[in-house]
Amino acid sequence: CAPECRSFCPDQKCLKDCGCI
């Protein structure tokens, strides 16, 4: 996922919209 998404989900799988699984 994109870096800005990782800040939201550091140790979860990120979705394309930066959501978490």
UniProtKB/Swiss-Prot annotation:
- Would the keyword Ion transport be found if you checked this record's keyword annotation? no
Q: Which UniProt keywords apply?
A: Disulfide bond, Nematocyst, Secreted
Question: From which domain of life does this come?
Answer: Eukaryota
- Main localisation: other
The record's tissue-specificity note reads: Expressed in tentacles.
Q: Where in the cell is it found?
A: Nematocyst; Secreted
Q: Mind naming one GO cellular-component term on file for this protein?
A: extracellular region
Q: What cystine pairs are annotated?
A: 1-18, 5-14, 9-20
Q: What job does this protein perform? A: Peptide of unknown function. Does not exhibit antimicrobial activity against Escherichia coli and Staphylococcus aureus. Promotes cell proliferation of human fibroblast skin cells. Does not exhibit any effect on voltage-gated ion channels, including potassium, sodium, and calcium channels.
Protein name per UniProt: Peptide Hact-2
Q: Which organism is it from?
A: Heliofungia actiniformis
